[in-house]
Amino acid sequence: MSTLHVLSHSPFSDTRLSSCLRILGSQDALLLCGDAVYALQPESHPLKALEQKIETLTLFFLAEDLTARNLECPWWATSIDYPAFVELSVRYDKVNSWL
């Protein structure tokens, strides 16, 4: 069963991102939105954790949040808009929002 995991909190304020990365299944995907996109800050531990999963991680970023924080989507991830977020929510069997 595939799950879309959605994180919106800063990776610098708690351990949600690292916890999520530990439990991701092979059919799962991760969408970072809101302050979670700060995981892309250069040289940061969250970015290194994401980069270590490049080969197995299906990763999405909400484009609007990247733009608002002046960050760019890396080549190994996909930047999406809100309509694509809705499509992802339907494509996966479950959606798990890490509140």
Where are these regions (language model features)?
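Charged helix-capping and loop-helix junction motifs
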Residues: 43-48, 78-81
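Structural motif
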Residues: 7-10, 34, 64, 99
